[in-house]
């Protein structure tokens, strides 16, 4: 009922903006998009710096940064959503944050992406629609309606 404006950030991946910024009157998500053939993606160097910048922006601005992780070669819903842990969330973002899985930790306590531990995109969309007061169930997003383009999916 209430669409998102999705903006691709110029110089994406820098300054904590992530690759996409999904905006709606009541919520905003900076989103870092990653894809790989491997179910696990370890963050180091530039990718770890991106994570730290996302966390910093989330903490300073009261936003919920997300990772959208696509597993290449998977048919259907190949996207998984995970959140970056931040402090000071309020309102709907705080409520949504409780249901979205965090980035898992290695044995050394370092965050990484694990496709199996992420939330399927269709469930995330259902969750966001429910936060808008719409009556939407996970079953109302048939797999055929999932569009492979992340920018298109979130803006619908």
Label for each model-derived stretch:
Residues 16:
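Beta-rich catalytic cores
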Residues 64-135, 146:
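Domain-level recognition of nuclease-like catalytic cores that cleave nucleotide substrates
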Residues 20-22, 26-37:
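Conserved catalytic cores of phosphodiester-cleaving nucleases, focusing on short active-site segments
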Residues 36-70, 74-75:
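Short, charged, amphipathic alpha-helix that recurs within catalytic cores of restriction-modification
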Residues 1-11, 60:
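Acidic-basic catalytic patches of nuclease active cores, encompassing PD-(D/E)XK
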Residues 7, 31, 66-68:
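Hydrophobic/aromatic beta-strand patches that form the interior of the parallel beta-sheet core
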């Amino acid at each position: 009922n209430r669409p998102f404006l999705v903006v691709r950030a110029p110089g994406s991946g820098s300054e904590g903006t992530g690759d996409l910024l999904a905006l709606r009157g009541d919520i905003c998500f900076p989103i870092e998009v990653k894809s790989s053939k491997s179910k696990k993606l370890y963050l180091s160097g530039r990718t770890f710096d991106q994570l730290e910048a996302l966390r910093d922006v989330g903490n300073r601005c009261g936003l919920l940064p997300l990772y959208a992780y696509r597993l290449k070669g998977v048919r259907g819903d190949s996207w998984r959503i995970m959140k970056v842990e931040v402090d000071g969330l309020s309102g709907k973002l705080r409520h949504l944050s409780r249901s979205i899985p965090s980035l898992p930790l290695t044995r050394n306590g370092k965050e990484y992406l694990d496709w199996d531990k992420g939330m399927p995109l269709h469930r995330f969309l259902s969750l966001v629609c429910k936060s808008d007061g719409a009556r939407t169930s996970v079953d109302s997003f048939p797999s055929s309606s999932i569009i492979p383009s992340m920018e298109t999916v979130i803006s619908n």
